[in-house]
Swiss-Prot record:
Catalyzes the first step in hexosamine metabolism, converting fructose-6P into glucosamine-6P using glutamine as a nitrogen source. The keyword Lipoprotein does not apply. Gene3D superfamilies: Glucose-6-phosphate isomerase like protein, domain 1, Glutamine Phosphoribosylpyrophosphate, subunit 1, domain 1. Residues 2-229 form the Glutamine amidotransferase type-2 domain. Residues 301-440, 473-618 form the SIS domain. This is Glutamine--fructose-6-phosphate aminotransferase [isomerizing]. PANTHER family: GLUCOSAMINE--FRUCTOSE-6-PHOSPHATE AMINOTRANSFERASE, ISOMERIZING, GLUTAMINE--FRUCTOSE-6-PHOSPHATE TRANSAMINASE (ISOMERIZING). Homodimer.
Length: 628
């Protein structure tokens, strides 16, 4: 998500930090900032909302006025992707303590920031921003001046780290200790660059690849103290018994800058597919507490949720497919009727809306023109509108009554991947919140469903680890002119999404069908050697859909088609009928799409690459569709 850089050494930090921020612009951001510490104990912070050019203009203005404060050989930099607080100058990083002595930059979410902020405010601390980040710098300042580690900057940071909950990377610098940077990570990435008489720290190696190729990747719940002469890695308690190779990884970077931005992958899309475990985990983070779904930021009370008597979901493209999946979950958990509508069609058919209607508008960018117009139409009919969006401060959340942000981070590839899985997770959170408020699920039932959802990131990692065979299948079927996708129940929207991905990336004719419709026309398309990809329901499915889809597969094979079947790993009955079998872990029916989608993403990217197309920038498509 956010881009972080830190430098301590013998050269002027300003240009090094700004250049590093420029190299990390590919990550996406809505504001940028820099903190510089000079040898005289001065800390200067400059930050601006908008593009990096805005920050550079501010730095140039400082130069023209007096030029003071922008020297020094220790610096921090940050490009922000907003999660707490709107994208404004005051919410941009770095943040400082009240005395202006300590600066911090942060990526991730401090889950327990609300009670920590209340504690600090009760002690008289005044906050200058709406962010969770500012809590960390005030806690360190108090620990440094009043705590049992007073006067010891690194020890004060470690003491505070032990109080923080969530997923985060934090990097601190202090004017009282100008040659030192203290950094830490929990779940979000952090790498060090080892130079000659200088050290770097960053969200990824793009931050320092022009200066050094020797790097260290920190492990989970580890901190590092950096000086120009070297580094010391500890756990959050300060223990330094850690060993390279076992607890953290030392490596040499062989990539060029272009590859570094993509994390060593050939395309951003492949990198983003690999980031799906963290996209889902981050979207769920902080939304379950004391056996309850907690959606504080969405701004709809339990009473308002109880008054809902029908739900409409409006979206376009991949987001529409996530809405189709949400229908199954919300209806099952809440017993509310749910309609899913293409946003481009919604307002042209005079849908029946009123004050008891909840309209869920799903948009990755928050700027999708058709979805925005659907939101405006719903508002004129007095319906309540909940936006599910990946971009803080965008137009759709601003006009909606409530918002639930996915936390997938910037998605550079035009074809949606990690934002799709994050949308599914967010949709399911809404469904569980509705069930909880309406009493259609007991608290222990809500908790059980959430715990299975919470377990999905680890299962997604397992699926990703087995994708080599899918890449090989993509090579084999790249010359095909048509591919069909079949599914039942939640497998049907997955089939639609698989077909869309293949159209977008490989410019190939692809269609997704509900398998029960096969006899009603699509079976006429089946001929010799046609690839048909089948998303198999669980053999434990109570509706007997597994047996019905087995029958469909036999019909397809009888006509000479080649079957590629995505099935759960304990599904032995499907093996004789699959020409190619892709196995995924066994999960409850509603959660299977979070796993079965992944092979289809990898397949589409592989076919596109084999056909010589740009996976990240398919022709005629844009990431954000801002015209109707």
């Amino acid at each position: 998500m956010c881009g972080i850089v830190g430098y301590v050494g013998h050269r002027p930090a300003r240009d090094i930090v700004v250049d590093a921020l420029r190299r990390m612009e590919y990550r996406g951001y809505d504001s940028a900032g820099i903190a510089l510490i000079d040898g005289n104990g001065g800390l200067t912070v400059r930050r601006r909302a908008g593009r990096l050019a805005n920050l550079e203009a501010t730095l140039a203005e400082t130069d023209s006025n007096d030029g003071d404060g922008l020297g020094g050989s220790t610096g921090l930099g940050h490009t922000r992707w907003a999660t707490h607080g709107r994208p404004t100058d005051r919410n941009a990083h770095p943040h400082r303590d009240a005395a202006g002595k300590i600066a911090v930059v942060h990526n991730g979410i401090i889950e327990n920031f609300a009670p920590l902020r209340a504690e600090l405010e009760a002690a008289g601390v005044e906050f200058a921003s709406d962010t969770d980040t500012e809590v960390a710098v005030h806690l360190v300042a108090r620990q440094y001046t009043q705590g049992d580690t007073a006067g010891d900057f690194p020890a004060s940071v470690l003491a505070v780290l032990q109080r923080l909950e969530g997923h985060f990377t934090l990097v601190f610098a202090s004017a009282d200790d100008p040659g030192t940077i203290v950094a830490a990570r929990r779940s979000t990435p952090l790498v060090l660059g080892i130079g000659d008489g200088e050290m770097f720290v960053g969200s990824d190696v793009a931050a320092f690849i022009e200066h050094t190729r020797d790097a260290v990747e920190l492990g989970q719940d580890q901190a590092v103290v950096l000086t120009a002469d070297g580094y010391r890695i500890t756990d959050f308690a300060g223990n330094d018994h850690l060993e390279a190779g076992r607890d953290f990884r030392e490596f040499h970077i062989d990539w060029d800058l272009n590859a570094a931005e993509k994390g060593g992958y050939d395309y951003f899309m492949l990198k983003e597919i690999a980031e799906q475990p963290s996209a889902v985990a981050d979207t769920l983070l902080g939304h379950f507490d004391k056996n309850r779904i907690v959606l504080d930021e969405q701004r709809l009370s339990d009473q308002e949720l109880r008054e809902i008597d029908k739900v409409f979901i409006v979206a376009c493209g991949t987001a529409y497919h996530s809405g189709l999946l949400a229908k199954y979950a919300i209806e099952h958990w809440t017993r509310l009727p749910v309609e899913v509508e293409l946003a481009s069609e919604f307002r042209y058919r005079d849908p029946v809306l009123d004050r008891s209607t909840l309209v869920i508008a799903i948009s990755q960018s928050g700027e999708t023109a058709d979805t925005l117009e659907a939101v405006r139409h719903a508002k004129t009919q007095k319906a309540k509108v909940l936006a599910i969006c990946n971009t803080n401060g965008s137009q759709i959340p601003r006009e909606a009554d409530a918002v639930l942000y996915t936390r997938a981070g910037p998605e550079i590839g035009v074809a949606a991947t990690k934002t799709f899985l994050a949308q599914i997770a967010a949709n399911y959170l809404v469904g569980l919140a509705l069930a909880q408020a309406r009493g259609t699920k007991y608290p222990d039932e809500v908790a059980r469903e959430y715990r299975e959802l919470e377990a999905m990131p680890d299962l997604i990692k397992r699926v990703l680890a087995g994708m080599d065979s899918v890449a090989a299948l993509a090579e084999r079927f790249a010359p095909s002119s048509t591919v069909l996708f079949l599914g039942r129940h939640v497998g049907y929207p997955v089939a639609l999404e698989g077909a869309l991905k293949l159209k977008e990336l490989a410019y190939m004719h692809a269609e997704g069908f509900a398998a029960g419709e096969l006899k009603h026309g699509p079976i006429a398309l089946i001929d010799e050697n046609l690839p048909v990809i089948v998303v198999m329901p669980s053999p434990k499915n109570a509706a007997m859909l597994h047996a019905k889809l087995l029958s469909n597969i036999r019909e397809i094979q009888a006509r000479g088609a080649v079957t590629v079947v995505i099935a759960e790993e304990d599904d032995d009955t499907v093996r004789p009928y699959a020409d190619h079998l892709i196995e995924i872990p066994s999960v409850s029916t509603l959660f299977q799409p979070l796993l079965s989608t992944i092979p289809l993403q990898v397949f589409a990217a592989g076919v596109a690459r084999a056909r010589g197309y740009d996976v990240d920038k398919p022709r005629n498509l844009a990431k954000s569709v801002t015209v109707e």
